From Swiss-Prot:
Binding-site positions, substrate: 29-32, 85-88, 98-101, 125
Pfam families: Rib_5-P_isom_A
Quaternary structure annotation from Swiss-Prot or TrEMBL: Homodimer.
InterPro entries, per database record: NagB/RpiA_transferase-like, Ribose5P_isomerase_typA_subgr, Ribose5P_isomerase_type_A
Name of the protein in its database record: Ribose-5-phosphate isomerase A 1
Known catalytic reactions: aldehydo-D-ribose 5-phosphate = D-ribulose 5-phosphate
Gene Ontology cellular-component annotations: cytosol
Keywords: Isomerase
Gene name tied to this protein: rpiA1
HAMAP family: Rib_5P_isom_A (MF_00170)
One annotated GO molecular function: ribose-5-phosphate isomerase activity
Keyword Ligase assigned: no
Catalytic-site annotation from UniProt: 107 (proton acceptor)
Function: Catalyzes the reversible conversion of ribose-5-phosphate to ribulose 5-phosphate.
Amino acid sequence: MNEQDKLKKAVGEKAATMVKDGMKVGLGSGSTVYWMIRSLGERIQQDGLKIEGIPSSNQTATWAEEAGIPLTDFSNVKELDITIDGADEVDANNHLIKGGGAALFREKIIAQAAKEFVIIVDQSKVVETLGEFSLPVEVLPFSWQRTANEISKLGCVPTVRVHEEEPLVTDNGNYILDCPFKVIPHPDKLNKEIKSIVGVIETGLFIDMATTVIVGEKDNIYIK
């Protein structure tokens, strides 16, 4: 296991300790969340922890089932006690870019549904200003080229994310446009501008949503 994976494992295990008996838990996506799910599974097996989870992606659902975490959905749950997820960038104000794993729409739903939204990252994801990581935007496949052209007027050249030489299709049946803005000094303004474009489903900008950010750096875990 390399150093970055060790940090992901450490922050994932730390976040898992925040989950208490009886909680409804939003399960995010990505490699850091994998370790959190593993740790929750161990607590279920060893300590009899009783929780229910709502996954943000099909991959997360598979990991949760393998870990023995009972799953539910929003037909049975109105509110989540906690959602734990990773991020691609976290800025000085704890605004986020997410969506590198193409699950941003469902991730935002379970984040907004939770009383507490905990982000787990390694130090490499912490930045002063968002934008170095291309901003993912989920769009309808119908006329995605036109949607991309409208987004380009805001200051970037979007590209459709591909998988095996075809546009990647999200769990919701949509496409992802990766938008390299380079620097996003006013994420709230940009988020509103992009979401006003017809054809946009959701952006990977998570503004004022994270309640806690757990960061792993060499030999240390700190709360941001």
